[in-house]
Amino acid sequence: MAESDWDTVTVLRKKGPTAAQAKSKQAITAAQRRGEEVETSKKWSAGQNKQHTITRNTAKLDRETEELHHDRVPLEVGKVIQQGRQGKGMTQKDLATKINEKPQVIADYECGKAIPNNQVMGKIERVIGLKLRGKDIGKPMDPGPKK
């Protein structure tokens, strides 16, 4: 009870601004108006793992004119897939479920938009029974050895 004197004064203060509020443009200009010292510095590469730096010369990469694009499935292969599938009386969805892929994958292969994947091509070859890779595209596949 020693502090309940008539002579003592209790001062209640507001909390200071949070980090997000202190960084705002308004807070900076207000501090400058009050005449406080304001230090602004841009964080550079904060929060990045700098153990692995880029070793390639970026100027050299800029000068390179090589076109970076992926090869697509030729339209010829798409037509062979379509004919083989229709010859077996299958829809795109049926073929997709047989090879455990999405129907969109089959559609992409047939219209020539897909990037060729040897695993998918092999699965399609086995189901429709036609070669899709190599020089004799569209020829019937040789029956493999029975195990």
Swiss-Prot record:
Protein keywords: Activator, DNA-binding, Nucleus, Transcription, Transcription regulation
Localisation per UniProt entry: Nucleus
DNA-binding region boundaries: 92-111
Residue ranges with Polar residues bias: 46-58
Signal peptide positions (record): none
Feature: compositional bias, Basic and acidic residues: 33-42, 59-69
GO MF terms, alphabetically ordered: DNA binding
Stated name of the protein: Endothelial differentiation-related factor 1 homolog
